[in-house]
Amino acid sequence: MALQLKTSIDIDAAPDAVWAVLSDLPAYPSWNPFIREARGELAAGERLDVKMQPEGGRAMRFRPTVLNAEPGRELRWRGRLVAPGVFDGEHRFAIEATPGGSRLLQEERFTGVLVPLLAKGLRTRTLPAFEQMNEAVKERAEAGSAKAAS
């Protein structure tokens, strides 16, 4: 079984400003309501150390592999629980230029034998956490763009 979660938000900032927020992993604890910590190099093939905690949920640490890190456009990684096929997630942040700035798309495709057991929690806790993170990225990117413009 597979489950796809998908959110997007329009941001009044250039794609590079949105990327600057997403790629500044050391700053995550100061602003990110979902990914509380993230360490590592944003380059294909590299492993990250990520601690997630949706509101009302338990903290979970995992070590995803970066699949793509294209500045101003996309950050994508794959994480696994235990072994391939048990519970896998491919997470993607895509940044699209719009006439007024950018659109941030955040999505994750979950596959594996545990998906049916975890689907309800993913929909009720993880999807709102994506939306909260999108709002926080928007706030931070727009604040950074306003500073740069002054």
Regions found by a protein language model. Give the residues of each.
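Hydrophobic ligand-binding cavity/cleft-lining segments
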Residues: M1-A43, R103, A136, A149-S150
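Short, contiguous strand/loop micro-motifs
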Residues: A13, V50, G79, K120-G121
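Hydrophobic-ligand binding "helix-grip"
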Residues: P29, R39, Q53-R103, R109-L114, ...
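Short coil-to-beta transition motif at edge beta-strands of beta-rich domains
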Residues: G45-D49
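A conserved amphipathic terminal alpha-helix motif
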Residues: R103-L105, R109-S150
